[in-house]
Structure formats: C-alpha cells, structure tokens
Amino acid sequence: MATEIDLLRDQNVKLNDILRQHQIEHIFRDPAMQNSMSKGGRGDTLTNSVNDQSALPPLIAEYEKHLEELNRQLTYYQKHMGEMKLQLETVITENERLHSKLKDAVEKQLEALPFGTGIGNDICADDETVRNLQEQLQIANQEKNWAVQLWQTASQELESVQKLYQEHMTEAQIHVFENRKQKDQLNNFQQLTKKLHVANENIEMTNHHFLKTVTEQNMEIEKLRKQLRQAKLDLRVAVTKVEELTKVTEGLQEQMLKKEEDIMSAQGKEEASDRRVQQLQSSIKQLESRLCIAIQEANVLKTGKTQLEKQIKELQAKCSESENEKYEAISRARDSMQLLEEANIKQNQILLEEKQKEVEREKMKKTISHLIQDAAIKARKEVESTKKQYEVLILQLKEELSALQMDCDEKQGQIDRAIRGKRAVEEELEKIYREGKQDEGDYRKLEEMHQRCLAAERSKDDLQLRLKTAENRIKQLEINSSEEISRSHEMIQKLQTVLESERENCGFVSEQRLKLQQENEQLQKETEDLRKVALEAQKKAKLKVSTMEHQFSIKEHGFEVQLREMEDSNRNSIVELRHLLAAQQKTANRWKEETKKLTESAEMRISSLKSELSRQKLHTQELLSQLEMANEKVAENEKLILEHQEKANRLQRRLSQAEERAASASQQLSVITVQRRKAASMMNLENI
C-alpha cells in the first residue's frame, strides 16, 4: 500500500506540472493577455503558494486522527486498570471472608468440645469429630492453595499491565517528538510564505516599472508617427534620401530575421516576440509601400527636377533636420529594445527561482509522505499487538471458566451425596422412633445419627455458599469475556471499514489518473494541431507577401487610393489600440485586486493554521497531564500491590496459626479420648 501511495503522489506531481505548462501556453495564446506576460510569474507563484497551503489541511486531519486513536487507547488502558483493581479487591474480600469462616468454624468446634464434663459420651462420636476436623483442615489447605494461585495470576496480570504502560509511555514520547517535528515544518512553511510575499512585491514593482516604460514608449511612438507624417510630405520631394531609407529597411529586415531565429530557440518567449515582430513587420511593410510610392513619385518628379532645384535647396535644410530627428528616434527605439531584453532576463531569473522553490516543495512533500507511512505502520503494529493480547486474555478466561465449571460439578456432587446421607439418616430415625426406646445403645445411636445430621446440614450450607460464590464468579467472568469479545469485534469491524475506504480511495485515484492522462493526450494533440496550423499560416503569409510585392510592382497607379484607406485604417487602429490599452489597464487592476484577495485568503489560512497549532499544543499538554495522572495511578497501583502482598503474608501467618491450633486441638482430642476410655474402663470395672 505504501509503494502504491508513493507512485500515485509522484504521478500527481507530474500531472500538476503538465497542467501548469498547459496553463502557461494557454495564457500565451490568449490575445487579451499579449501585453500582460510579465504578470504570469506572479500568477504562477500565487498558484504555487495556494497549492502548497492546500496540501497542509489533509496532513493536519491525519495528525488529529492519530491523536484521537492515542486518546482512545489511553481510555481503554485506564478502563482495563480499573477492572484489574476491581478483580484484586474481589479476590482480597473473598480471601478475608474465607479466613473469617475458617476461624469461626474452628472456634465453634473448639468451643463445642467438652473438656472433662462429657465422660459418658461415646468414643465413636469423638472419632467422627476428629475426621470432620481433618476434612475441614484439608479443605482449608485447598482454599489456601487456590488463594495463592489467584494471587499469582493477579501479580502476572499486574506485570502485563506495567509492560503495557511502559510501551504506552514510549509511544507518547515518540508522539511528542513527532509534534516537535511538525512544528518545525510549519515554521518552515511560514518562512516560505513570507519569502513568496516578498517575491510577489518585487514582481509587482517590476510590473509597475514595465507599465511605465510601456506608456512612455507609446507616447514616443505617437510622437514618432506625427513626425513620420511630416517626413512623408518631405520625402515626396527628397529623392536623394530614398536610397538611404531602402538600405535602412534592408538592415532592419536582416535584424528581424536574426530575431526570428532567436525566438525559435526560446519556446517560452516565442509567442510574445512573434507578435512584436509581426507589428514591426507590418510597420516596415507600410514604410516599404510608402517608399515604393515615393520612388514612383520621384520618377514622375525627375521630369520637373529642373523646375524645383531651387525648392530642393530650401528643403535640404529641412531634410537634415528630419534626419537628425530620425536618428534620435532610432536611438530611442534601441534603448527601448535594451529595456525589453533586461525585463526578459529578469523574468528568466524569476522562473529559475520558482523552479528551485518547486524542487524544495517536492522534497518537503516526500518527507511528509514518509512520516505518514511510518504512522500507518505503527498503527498496524499496535492493532496486531492489541489483537494478540485480547486473544490471550480470551483463552485465559475460557480456561478459568472450564476450571470453575469443573469445581461447580464436584461441589454439586458433594451436595447430592450429603442430601442422600441426610435422607438415609432421617429414614433410620423414623424407624427408630417407630420401634420405640428399648435400650441405652439405641439412645446412643440416635444421638450419633443426630450429630451426623447436624454435620451433614453444616456441610450442605457450606457447599451451597461455595456454589453461590462460584456461580457469581462464573457470571462475572462470562460478562467480562463477552464484553472483551464485543470490543474485539468492534475493532475488527472498524479496521475492515478503514481498509474498504482506502481501497475505494485508491480506485477513485486510479480513475482520476486515467482521466487526466486522457486529457493530457488530448491537449498534446491539440497543441500539435495548433503548431501545424501556425506553420501553415506562416507559409501562407509568406506566399501572400511575395504575391503582394509582385502586385505592388504591377499596380503602381492604385496605391494612392490605398494610401488614403491605410490612413483611415491607421486612425481606426490607433483608436483600437487605445481601447486595448484601456482594457489592459482594467485587466491589470483586476489582477491587482485578485492578488490582494489571494494574499488575504493566504493570511486567513495562515491564521487558521496558527489557531490549529495552538489547539494542538493544548491537546498535547492535556495528553501530558493525562500521562502524569497515569504515572500517579501506576504508583498508587504499586502501593496497592505492596499492601496486597502484606495482606497475603498476614493471611499465610493466620493460616499457619490456624494449623497450629488445629494440631493442638487434635492433641487435646487424643488426650480426651484416652481419658474417656479410662473412665469407661473404670465404669465397667465398677459395674462388674
């Protein structure tokens, strides 16, 4: 999955680059954007900054999801610790209760024993009491062993909980380290945004200077046009200057050819330079047509040269002045071309800086993708570890349930046996009461049977209490096991839903990728078609130019009408150019407003990111406080464990004391039996 995500991200980066190139080509082809090419860099930087800022919210969302998962795990571990505490408390209370029951039973039996007054009782009753005491001692030892086993299991569970807590502490430290890294990355993003703002301001300043130069050049062009109109009237008379103008036009044509070759090498500046060259070519063609007309007029005027020699001398002074003005205009045009070349160099530098920034952004995206992959791998490992732990707990609970069920079956068998013995004793008592009191031996048998009944009832009560406790434990264990199974099922369902959503996202991304590839292929085909059309148009234009030159050489008389029409068209073109300048100014103002809006939106996003950072800081502080609380709870749990160990030691001491008392009681019983036998022998002797 990680490799597929990397491939998809790389393909998205490539597609974004292709779309940017297509947007740039579309801007160059748009006729409304011919004179606003310097603003393209600013638009690209703004779009890049917006794209970079749009890439941050999904990362923050994933980070918040990871924090929510960690919070859920914390709550789950806290609940588990509480359940373990409750289980320990129940074990302690059961141990204390069993100890109190044993103590009460032993004390009652010791109090019930006669120390010298019951000489007339039977020896068989003493033997039965001794057996009962021995059975009770065995039961007490079994319960002691069972309590020790419970204590060992509780200690093992506490050790496992401590291990889980240590693992959680390490994960929390890693999480804090990742938070610091993300803060550093956000600081870097803020610095980059500041740099982009500075670059945008510089670009705006350069655009303002460029607009000023363009307006000045337009003013100079208008002045030059006025001067050219005046020079046209003078050129009709000045025949000698026609050859010099033809040489100048040939030099300009050679320069234009060289410029066309340079423009073919530079793809990014091709369209803007072509348009400027076309404008210059149109002006040169106009000049050539006017020069042809002037040549024709010069041929006509050669016949009247003798008449106008005097006027030529007067006009030579004017021609010299016009030549000086032309030379000044040419120098100004050269200066304007140098300024344009400097502006183009600055644009190239800005584009190089933007490419470097894009490379740095791609590196940042790669680092972020690596961080996301590491977080996903950690989450999977945690889920697998929790699954294994729950499976182990479920197996342990099943084993405990089976053991408790076996104990319950054994205790039910003992109860059934006691009930059968009781019924047999009751039947014997009924028989004895029916037969009546015949001998003292029968009376003794009745007392023995009565004592047996009492012992059976006591054992029955004890076994019933134990059965109830065992059933309660079984119910609690079943409830706990069902809850844990339901939790594990919920976790599995959540994981399955997450996997399905990721698969759907991958399919959707692949579909989008195919669509974008198809669109890119269509765009490439369209660009190739447009290039072919442009080449064909250039060829057609060249053919038309050649045919027009031949037609101009043939149709000399129709140029006067065409001159008038061209003057009208020039006026209309001037009006149109003014309208275009106004439209360009409007578009420039609109671009300024849009840049302001984009900067405001970027600032709003930065402020929102700052607020999210503060919220995340508060969240991390809350997590740290929760970790401190968890540490305090662990310390309290350790104290409770020590207290439970002390209680267990006390219980062991009490059990040892009870065993000693039982041993002393057995000795006393043996002494009493010996005394009773002696007394019985003495009574027999006296009777004899």
From Swiss-Prot:
Modified residues (N-acetylalanine): A2
Compartmental location: Cytoplasm, Cytoskeleton, Microtubule organizing center, Centrosome, Centriole
PTM-bearing positions, type Phosphoserine: S681
Record GO terms (molecular function): clathrin binding; sodium channel regulator activity
Expression by tissue: Detected in small neurons in dorsal root ganglia. Detected in C-type fibers of sciatic nerve (at protein level).
Annotated coiled-coil segments of the chain: 59-673
Keywords per UniProt: Acetylation, Coiled coil, Cytoplasm, Cytoskeleton, Phosphoprotein
Subunit structure: Interacts with SCN10A and clathrin. Identified in a complex containing SCN10A, clathrin and SCLT1.
Function: Adapter protein that links SCN10A to clathrin. Regulates SCN10A channel activity, possibly by promoting channel internalization.
PANTHER family: SODIUM CHANNEL AND CLATHRIN LINKER 1
Protein name (Swiss-Prot/TrEMBL): Sodium channel and clathrin linker 1
